[in-house]
A protein has these predicted regions:
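Repeat-based scaffolding regions
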Residues: 1-254
Length: 254
């Protein structure tokens, strides 16, 4: 293959050789080594990278692959290539080598050069979840909220931030505020309403719970579900707020 000048043809021949090694010779490690020789020219090729990673997984060669890419980082001259390579290696450390520190270091480099890199920020979120570093997780989610403009993504981030405050930090007030912000962005999202209703009930904020249940009823299509919510509102008026008049009015609508 060394005498072949055309890069596309050279890659095609190497891929064919790798396929023969794996399927005919039953030597996936040889197939991996064959493709390794094409990395420098083809690491930006999505199909090539998918096959390379498949073989790395099949042969347990992630450490070797990461080492090769670490060497490429040291030799890269394009700032864009350096960032892209750091991103790739960081993900491999996290997902395949379970090395949180190495993954963090590579993503930290990316963010130092590109503080608004949403992909790197999202990856750092995963690292902090794994490490249980809740304060840093709050910071990184807040940073992502500052940079994210897509409404559905902002809703998801507020919901995730609320979960951190509620379940990991134990700050129910902050959690409620996050869920409220998510609701304001998506007033027709039933899943957001149910989460807000759940935490209002847990916090015994009965008036707020009734308000959100009323909003929930407005978007429900199923008649039986509407009846169940209306009955629930009645029981809250009766048992929690001791307002029999409001309870009777709610029951009357069932």
């Amino acid at each position: 293959a060394d005498i072949v000048d055309d890069a596309a043809l050279r890659l095609s021949l190497l891929e064919r050789g790798a396929k023969i090694a794996e399927e005919k010779l039953q030597q996936p490690q040889m197939a991996f080594v064959v493709l390794q020789s094409a990395i420098a020219e083809n690491w930006k090729n999505a199909d090539f990278m998918a096959e390379l990673q498949r073989l790395a997984e099949a042969t347990g060669s992630w450490g070797e692959l990461v080492g090769q890419f670490e060497g490429m980082i040291a030799q890269a001259t394009s700032p864009a290539d350096v960032l892209a390579l750091h991103n790739i290696v960081a993900r491999w450390y996290f997902h395949h080598l379970n090395d949180n520190e190495a993954s963090w270091n590579h993503f930290a480099f990316v963010l130092d050069q590109d503080p608004k890199n949403l992909d790197a920020l999202a990856a750092m979120t995963e690292i902090y979840w794994r490490l249980g570093n809740w304060d840093e997780l709050v910071n990184i989610l807040s940073k992502r909220l500052e940079l994210t403009t897509v409404t559905d993504d902002r809703v998801s981030l507020y919901m995730e931030l609320g979960k951190v405050f509620e379940e990991k930090i134990g700050d129910v007030g902050q959690a409620i505020e996050c869920y409220i912000q998510a609701f304001k962005l998506s007033e027709d999202r039933l899943d957001v309403m149910k989460e807000l209703a759940r935490i209002y009930e847990m916090a015994e904020q009965w008036s707020e719970l009734i308000d959100i249940l009323e909003r929930e009823m407005a978007v429900l299509d199923d008649v039986e579900e509407k009846i169940a919510v209306r009955f629930r509102i009645g029981t809250i008026w009766e048992n929690m707020l001791q307002n029999n008049e409001k309870a009777a009015a709610s029951y009357a609508e069932v």
